[in-house]
Amino acid sequence: MNLYSKLAARAANQNPVTVGMIGGGKFGSMFLAQARLTTGLQIAAVIDLAPERARANLAATGWAAEQYAATSISDAFKTGGTYVGDDAATMIASGGIDIVVDATGDPPAGIRHALLCCEHGKNVVMVNVEADALAGPLLARRAEEAGIIYSLAYGDQPALICEQVDWARAIGFKVVSAGKGTRDLPKIHQSTPDNVFDNYFVDAEVAKRGNMNPKMSTSFIDGTKSAIEMTAVCNATGLTPQANGLSFPPVSCYELADVLKPSSAGGSLDHAGTTEVISCLHRDGTDVEHHLQMGVYVVVEADNDYVSHCFEEYNLLHDKSAKYSAMYKPTHLIGLELGISVASIALRGEATGTPNGFRSDVVAT
């Protein structure tokens, strides 16, 4: 990894990576908190339908008022500061922006912004996973035709899962399953924005302090977000969904390889090369010990006994047969990690996950 040294070189040459961000909510604010501290990076513009909300979030994340006092995007380039406004189309059309980040959470808006990026030659990071699940493969194809990069957002679980799948395949492993953890119970699938924080087990003050959106938070525990994110993963990795969709089994970090393998091998999956989301709660509502609520995982298969023995010798999290083994990341940092996508695109010309076909979809049952 040498992204930091490349960013430092851009800073030394007074040629920072320039970003225009659309959507100043929770994800965007988390990115802004770290972007202010990142060498070689300039947030040239923050666009939001409510600019005052964006300014308040900039202040809350440690930005001094003079840092976002630019009167226009061109003024931001002259001063090295940040412009706050409400016109995404004008920002995307502006010269000097290297990368556009869509963090709106609005699928039609995200698709519209991505198409504008294709028209104006701007690389795009699609935080808006709802837009990606709906039209990502088409947007990625259009981006390729336009000579730009369309990328999933590092820090969000789909991109982190794509990274794990890529790691496994790049060293010759067959990927048996990949996915994430979440908080799931059948009885909380009926949650609404009015009662979501009761079911989310989050104190009301914590939710308010964190600017947690009740509608978005509901999607995290009613199954919606998990289905959308696994669709994004399938469309970007070639993994295919299970015949009956996601089952949210309660699984600990130490049980990944035992459970998340095909049923023919004693696991819970209907085939290898699929996705699954695991719950941090047992069906009685008690916590799974050593759960993976905020994390991601990949399960791989040993091709022969020699590799199985290596799994045992190096204390990997393997199943009883040592044929299957799991790797996991215990958490994801949302917007705090988004700078990896920005740096990877700008400095390597490489996306952090890109859809390349429609393999999955989301339905309500």
Regions found by a protein language model. Name each.
Residues G20, G24, D102-D106, V127-D132, ...:
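Glycine- and other small-residue-rich loops at beta-strand/loop junctions that grip anionic moieties
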Residues M1-L116:
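N-terminal glycine-/serine-/threonine-rich beta1-alpha1-beta2 phosphate-ribose binding loop
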Residues P108-H120, V129-I149, A153-D156, Q164-W167:
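Rossmann-fold NAD(P)-binding glycine/threonine-rich loop
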Residues N123-V125:
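A short hydrophobic/small-residue beta-strand
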Residues N2-R10, V202-T365:
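C-terminal catalytic/substrate-binding lobe primarily of soluble NAD(P)-dependent oxidoreductases
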Residues A143-E144, S151-I221:
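Rossmann-like NAD(P)H-binding beta-loop-alpha module
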Residues R36-G40, A59, W63, E144-I149, ...:
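Generic secondary-structure signature for well-ordered alpha-helical cores
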Residues L49-P51, A89, G105, V129-D132, ...:
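Short, ordered loop/turn segments at secondary-structure junctions
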